[in-house]
Amino acid sequence: MVFLRFILLSILFSLCICASADNNSNYQNDKITETKSDISALDKWEAGTIVSEKSIEKYGIDRCFVIEKISDAIFGRMYNKSYKGNCSVSRGELRYIKILHRNINGDILLGEIVCNKHIAKDLIVIFRELYNASYPIERMILIDNYDADDERSMSANNSSCFNFRFVAGTKSLSKHSRGMAIDINPLYNPYVKRTQSGSIDISPRIGSPYANRNKSFNYKIEKNDLCYKLFIAHGFKWGGDWSTVKDYQHFEK
């Protein structure tokens, strides 16, 4: 009887060991698959994709903060959207930059920006410092994904730079038209203008809860904020300092 119990216990123990080994093997296989998927996203630079720290380490972080000329593929995404037929800026004056950023949950995302070549190096340095500090930026994909519709892009809290367009309500070209201005977390840092009739225009429209800068909320840019400090240190001006309007999302050179 004792011998039979010993045999049964031995069998049960062996089964537990096998199950544990299978679970570990499945876990390792899942991690390998996840890393391969991340590396594929990194190779293709699928902006907006969440990737792991391990994948970044394997891929190489220096490859994740890069300035490139506008390729045919990128220009194809932009043409007749952010880069309109009457655009006064040459394709050669623009640059495509790859960056990493984190959201409010600490996830790492692939980001992309089209900017003027004269601020490309500034942006690479700034965004790398923001990434190292885990500064939250929710989304950073080309505005062309929103058909260059500024309202839609801002409403999605998408940070963007180049877009050939006029200043809201005017016939003057925006600094965005040359890729010399960038908007960061625009939903939570809206454009606010008091009209002659006394009403207040807010862009994006759904950003109105964040027009009151006395409130505390995530993604808010203010003067003690790291994002503000870095852009100012690199010679940018902040729209939140303007007197006639307030553009809290906006930094320009």
Give the role of each language-model region.
Residues M1-I7:
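Bacterial N-terminal signal peptides that target proteins for export
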Residues I7-L15:
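Bacterial N-terminal signal peptides
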Residues C18-S20:
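N-terminal Sec signal peptide cleavage junction
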Residues N23-R102:
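N-terminal module-boundary/linker segments of secreted carbohydrate-active enzymes
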Residues N26-W45, V167-G169, L173, G179-K253:
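Catalytic cores and adjacent binding grooves of peptidoglycan-active enzymes
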Residues V89-M154:
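Active-site acidic/histidine clusters and adjacent loop/turn architecture
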Residues D150-G179:
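Active-site-adjacent substructure of cysteine-protease-like catalytic cores
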